Amino acid sequence: MAERPPEDEAPQREPWDEWVVEVLEELKEEALKHFDPRLLTALGNYIYDRHGDTLEGAGELIRILQRALFIHFRSGCAHSRIGQSRGVL
């Protein structure tokens, strides 16, 4: 018989929706450093029109912002070390 920890001793996790909101806020702050706020507002409005105020919409916005930031950094953003030659800070 395998030992299992008592269920009440598991680490507490924050609710999923709170985590999504926190991640989205962090991505928004970072995106505002690199992209035109009008573009981000238009993207947010587009997602809202398609999904409303839902976790599905928030998830899609997170995926889009992550990809946009990655591509931006990878293509040589001056604020990032990603995509730069070794030894260059």
Curated annotation (Swiss-Prot):
Gene Ontology cellular-component annotations: host cell; host cell nucleus; virion component
Listed InterPro entries: RetroV_VpR/X
Record's subcellular location: Virion; Host nucleus
Gene3D superfamilies the UniProt entry points to: 6.10.210.10, VpR/VpX protein, C-terminal domain
GO biological process per UniProt: symbiont entry into host cell; viral penetration into host nucleus
Post-translational modification Phosphoserine, affected residues: 80
Keywords for this protein: Activator, AIDS, Cell cycle, Host nucleus, Host-virus interaction, Phosphoprotein, Transcription, Transcription regulation, Viral penetration into host nucleus, Virion, Virus entry into host cell
Pfam families: VPR
Cysteine pairings via disulfide bonds: none
Principal place of residence: virion
Annotated function: Stimulates gene expression driven by the HIV-2 LTR. Prevents infected cells from undergoing mitosis and proliferating, by inducing arrest or delay in the G2 phase of the cell cycle. Cell cycle arrest creates a favorable environment for maximizing viral expression and production.
Subunit details: Interacts with human UNG.
Protein name: Protein Vpr
Lineage, uppermost ranks: Viruses, Riboviria, Pararnavirae, Artverviricota, Revtraviricetes
